[in-house]
Amino acid sequence: ENITINSQMSDTPDVDSKGQEIGQEIAQEALQTEDVNKLYLTIAESLNQADVKDATVIRGDDYTYVSFTNNVFFDANSSVLTREGQAVLYTFAKAIAPAAGGIEQVNIMSHTAKVTDNSQTDPKTIRKDRILSAMRSAEVSIYLQHQNVIKPEKLVDISYGEYRPIADNSTEEGRIKNRRIEFLLLDNGAKERDLNEYYKEFKSGEYANTTVVTVGESQSSSQGG
């Protein structure tokens, strides 16, 4: 199958106007002092209100982690951001804007799933996997840069391809979990670590009390008292 590469953002006429709107709202990043310790709640609430389901938001000691399944942003074998994906990123951008001054770096991490046994040796599959993963993280980074919510030098796009699985690739359910976009928002002064170290913290349950999985506005409302 061919990979669809997104060549430009011109098919999204509202990107620049939205970016200017958010940029005007935050004025200068240096003035943004909202407590980064509460940022995970702001993000989760915003995503719930936007009816985004199954996003995981975690607050660690010096970072905020957010994970989405790939189908939120991209169609299969495509690096073109969907309209739905752009809307989710716009919501995410507005949510992090008030705390932008307290964020040192935003890692945008793209993951794919291993679909064939020879995926790590077949030249065509290697190329497809690496390019697709890299283009997806780049497109998310480009979209966020258009929104003017954080200094562009703080946006770092990273592509892991199939090499950081969190589930079993032998099942469709596992592959769906492995195809994902993650954000690691590092606080000012935080020391970046290997991604696997963060995963170990998540699995240990250390941050269970500061972990939110979004259910969307409709379910969130129905669960109220």
What does each of the following model-derived ranges do?
Residues 1-75, 191-224:
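Juxtamembrane linker/hinge segments adjacent to a transmembrane helix in small membrane proteins
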Residues 79-83, 99, 111-199, 219-224:
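Periplasmic OmpA-like peptidoglycan-binding domain that tethers envelope proteins to the cell wall
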Residues 36-58, 66, 74-110, 141, ...:
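Periplasmic peptidoglycan-binding/anchoring modules of Gram-negative envelope and division proteins
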